[in-house]
């Protein structure tokens, strides 16, 4: 079996993407943070003692996307052209739904950057809110959509 990230000597390597054509790459990822309804209310009302939870999570998610290649072995450093995070309150399930859309024009996709963005944003929500709710859950981290490159446009069912 040929592995893409292993060289002839059996050592790890970063895949050579230099022969690929540049194309617009977009990825959308999601994470969900489940919590007690009271915790969600405090976040919404700005009553968490550490400060503006979603404002800090927004910045953390952007920073996470920008640092993906430093965190994930063999991820190519990318020149991101856009990182946008959105947060939605799910009152029925006492959850915050995080979505990140990441864009670039380049030779490789931004799926890992989008997934890292929502993961870091979710961890930030947890960190800033854990004093009032230690049993929050970070769930459903997944890629929702991607476009660009050979695989074209894909959307999760």
Swiss-Prot record:
Catalytic activity annotation: (8S)-3',8-cyclo-7,8-dihydroguanosine 5'-triphosphate = cyclic pyranopterin phosphate + diphosphate
Catalytic residues in the record: 127
Residues reported to bind substrate: 74-76, 112-113
Source species, domain of life: Bacteria
Pathway: Cofactor biosynthesis; molybdopterin biosynthesis
One record GO biological process: Mo-molybdopterin cofactor biosynthetic process
GO MF annotations, alphabetized: cyclic pyranopterin monophosphate synthase activity
TM region positions: none
EC number(s) from the headed UniProt entry: 4.6.1.17
Gene3D superfamilies: Molybdopterin cofactor biosynthesis C (MoaC) domain (3.30.70.640)
UniProt KW keywords: Lyase, Molybdenum cofactor biosynthesis
Subunit structure: Homohexamer; trimer of dimers.
Family designation: Belongs to the MoaC family.
Entries under NCBIfam families matching the protein: moaC, PRK09364.1
Function, as annotated: Catalyzes the conversion of (8S)-3',8-cyclo-7,8-dihydroguanosine 5'-triphosphate to cyclic pyranopterin monophosphate (cPMP).
This protein's name: Cyclic pyranopterin monophosphate synthase
Species this chain originates from: Syntrophomonas wolfei subsp. wolfei (strain DSM 2245B / Goettingen)
Gene: moaC
